[in-house]
């Protein structure tokens, strides 16, 4: 007898079990005895604990035109309108460090599963986070290289980069070696037609964008140890940048050098019914600056992450699953200036746990299950202790699938979040000059911003609530939609100055530097704590793909996936300091924001040709000079739209064939011939436009004022060796 699993693909695992005896079946403890001679069992390799809400096969992944898995995840995050970075699992399991797989080529992926909200608690994710399951090829190997040349059509700021990569997967063993180099030419003031701004860059040697050189290397390996799996990573990077600025009438040359070395070691496996993961990571970095201020800084950090999950109780409707996790992190930062030396030590200790309880399971046998469908509640909590104080986290959620193709979910979280090491310890430095509208003087000026971290940041406290409805997929087009509502309230939220309005300068006068004539020359844009904020909005995401013939190879059938996202802000308010009035940013107080935004994308591939196109639009908005009332000196920005386009051509046909089991590369989806990519960002060279409240032209919003780059053409040559 042969037992078939419906919808099983050629990539599924197949086990052949001959002549199973009665005693063997009874001893296995897997239920009632079935007397069969031979059994063929088929099951999906790498399947997650729950079925996917959305699945992309190899052809759809290749149509994204991505260089690596990290770019694939970025594209998915945009298409699905995810508010947070997704939690990534590999082959249906949590691994110690999923990030080590981010540099692998996209065709190392067999399929991608976007899991429903119920998976978040099952895998220990943060409330509201989406879980993405990446199923890798069983056997895979490649040598890849590419050269990328980009240049604005207006000239200047050319960029040249190169990548080399060696990757391999053999069962549970995997490794990758990668090297990247890049050089960015400076953009000089003389290369742009800009009107002279008060106190601005009249010298043609002044750089509007710095020159930058970067070299980075990465090595990762994953190895099995009996029932365990270990992962090791080592990465290094060096970066240098040079710039020339006009600061208070003086020409200042600046040179920054950054070097970093990082590594991690992790292990995952099962013991005593628990699925366990642990990861130890560390990094050392050094930065040096000459020019605006002489000095150097050093930073060392060490972190340990532990997590575990297991099923506590098996109920008729499913198992009660718990997830526990802990995080220990410490860092030391030293900043050495010409006349001072300061050392800071930061630490974070946190632990959290979740409990997922199934209340109902859809089936045809129980009346309650038929009426209610799948229903699960999630409860969670945590404690956090760090340098700035401590806090707690409480969360809850509900996931309900009353019918096939319909899933409703909600999530609520109240927490005190930790402050990242980078936000606190990064040394301050002067960035590239930029044009800003000075509301106090009513003129456009060129300022030199102060960037970096802020050691005085306090842990923010936030409360989040979300509702989401997911529909589909329906029809042969795989039509699917997500409709969501989000509300976030924060106290001591971390942000930057919203805009350079009178309200903002009155609240933070120490962050504005003016010369003897009162002209604005520099603004401190390092992160700071805002007293309180409230954001409320709606999101909509629709995805569908062109139907393909069953069994057609990806080079024989057209692959096309469409996505459409729409965002609407209902409320956006902020109080800069305690005791100061609340500013309504949708009305333009304290720096206006767009109420609506829209994004559409198309990813298509047929044979040797590929097309990736996207269009984005955001509504216009007003920024008030003084909060609470419109003024003729307000800044009114027009709606903005831009289109990006990418064409891909493979020099020879990339026929897909199923490799023999002894062949190292596995099923091939990419040939070794040269691939040429031509990409145009901002196809129609759109630039921000604005006017004043009285209808006159706004200073600082000429063609080359706010957007110095405009349309960029990028040519990529890549090949598999």
Model-derived regions: residue spans:
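C-terminal beta-signal and adjacent terminal beta-strands/loops
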Residues: 61, 616-626, 650-721
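Transmembrane beta-barrel wall of Gram-negative outer-membrane proteins
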Residues: 144, 154-266, 270-273, 280-283
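Gram-negative outer-membrane beta-barrel transporters
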Residues: 486-497, 502-625
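A beta-strand signature from Gram-negative outer-membrane beta-barrel systems
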Residues: 95, 104-142
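Outer-membrane beta-barrel signature, preferentially recognizing the C-terminal barrel domain
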Residues: 417-482, 518, 523-538, 545-548, ...
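Short, acidic, small-residue-rich periplasmic hinge/interaction motif at the N-terminus
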Residues: 12-62
């Amino acid at each position: 007898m042969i037992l078939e699993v419906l919808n099983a693909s050629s990539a599924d695992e197949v086990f052949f079990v001959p002549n199973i005896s009665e005693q063997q079946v009874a001893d296995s403890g897997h239920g009632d005895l079935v007397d069969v001679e031979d059994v063929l069992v088929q099951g999906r390799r790498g399947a997650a604990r729950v079925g996917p809400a959305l699945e992309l096969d190899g052809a759809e992944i290749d149509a994204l035109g991505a260089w690596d898995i990290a770019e694939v995840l970025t594209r998915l995050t945009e298409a699905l309108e995810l508010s947070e970075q997704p939690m990534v699992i590999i082959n249906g399991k949590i691994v110690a460090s999923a990030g080590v797989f981010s540099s692998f080529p996209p065709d190392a992926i067999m399929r991608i599963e976007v899991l429903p909200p119920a998976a978040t608690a099952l895998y220990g994710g943060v409330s509201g986070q989406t879980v993405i399951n990446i199923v890798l090829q069983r056997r895979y190997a490649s040598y890849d290289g590419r050269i990328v040349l980009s240049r604005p059509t207006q000239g200047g700021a050319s960029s040249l980069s190169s990548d080399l990569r060696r990757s391999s997967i053999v069962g549970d063993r995997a490794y990758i070696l990668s090297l990247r180099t890049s050089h960015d030419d400076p953009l000089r003031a003389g290369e742009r037609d800009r009107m002279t701004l008060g106190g601005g860059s009249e010298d043609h040697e002044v750089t509007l964008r710095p020159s930058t050189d970067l070299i980075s290397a990465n090595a990762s390996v994953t190895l099995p140890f009996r029932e365990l799996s270990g992962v090791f990573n080592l990465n290094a990077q060096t970066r240098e940048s040079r710039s020339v600025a006009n600061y208070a009438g003086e020409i200042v040359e600046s040179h920054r050098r950054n070097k970093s070395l990082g590594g991690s070691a992790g292990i995952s496996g099962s013991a005593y019914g628990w699925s366990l993961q642990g990861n130890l990571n560390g990094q050392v970095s050094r930065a040096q600056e000459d020019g605006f201020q002489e000095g150097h800084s050093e930073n060392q950090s060490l972190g340990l992450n532990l997590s575990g999950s297991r099923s506590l109780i098996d109920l008729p409707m499913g198992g009660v699953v718990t997830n526990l996790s802990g995080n220990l992190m410490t860092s030391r930062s030293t900043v050495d200036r010409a006349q001072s030396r300061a050392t800071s030590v930061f630490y974070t200790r946190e632990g959290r746990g979740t409990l997922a309880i199934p209340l109902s399971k859809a089936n045809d046998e129980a009346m309650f299950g038929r009426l209610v469908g799948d229903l699960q509640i999630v409860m969670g909590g945590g404690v956090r202790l760090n340098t700035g104080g401590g806090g707690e986290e409480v969360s809850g959620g509900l996931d309900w699938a009353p019918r096939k193709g319909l899933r409703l979910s909600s999530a609520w979280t109240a927490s005190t979040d930790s402050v990242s090491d980078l936000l606190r310890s990064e040394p301050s430095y002067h960035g590239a000059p930029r044009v800003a509208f000075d509301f106090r003087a009513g003129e456009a000026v060129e300022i030199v911003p102060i960037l970096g971290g802020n050691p005085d940041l306090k842990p923010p406290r936030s409360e989040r609530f979300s509702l989401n409805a997911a529909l589909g997929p329906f029809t042969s087009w795989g039509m699917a939609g997500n409709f969501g509502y989000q509300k976030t309230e924060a106290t001591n939220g971390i942000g930057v100055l919203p805009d350079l309005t009178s309200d903002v300068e009155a609240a933070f006068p120490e962050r504005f530097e003016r010369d003897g004539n009162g002209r604005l020359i520099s603004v401190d844009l390092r992160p700071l704590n805002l007293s309180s904020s409230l954001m409320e909005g709606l999101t909509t995401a629709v995805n569908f793909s062109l139907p393909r013939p069953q069994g057609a190879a990806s080079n024989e059938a057209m692959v096309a996936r469409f996505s459409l996202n729409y965002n609407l802000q209902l409320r956006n308010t902020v109080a800069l300091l305690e005791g100061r009035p609340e500013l309504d940013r949708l009305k333009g107080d304290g720096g206006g924001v767009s109420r609506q935004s829209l994004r559409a994308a198309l990813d298509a591939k047929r044979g040797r040709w590929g097309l990736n196109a996207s269009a984005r639009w955001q509504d216009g908005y007003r920024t008030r000079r003084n909060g609470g009332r419109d003024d003729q000196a307000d800044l009114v920005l027009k709606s903005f739209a831009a289109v990006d386009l990418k064409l891909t051509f493979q020099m020879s046909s990339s026929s897909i064939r199923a490799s023999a089991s002894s062949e190292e590369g596995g099923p091939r989806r990419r040939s070794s011939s040269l691939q040429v990519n031509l990409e145009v960002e901002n196809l129609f060279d759109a630039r921000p436009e604005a006017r004043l409240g009285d209808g006159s032209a706004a200073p600082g919003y000429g063609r080359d004022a706010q957007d110095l780059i405009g349309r960029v053409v990028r040519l990529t040559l890549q090949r598999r060796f």
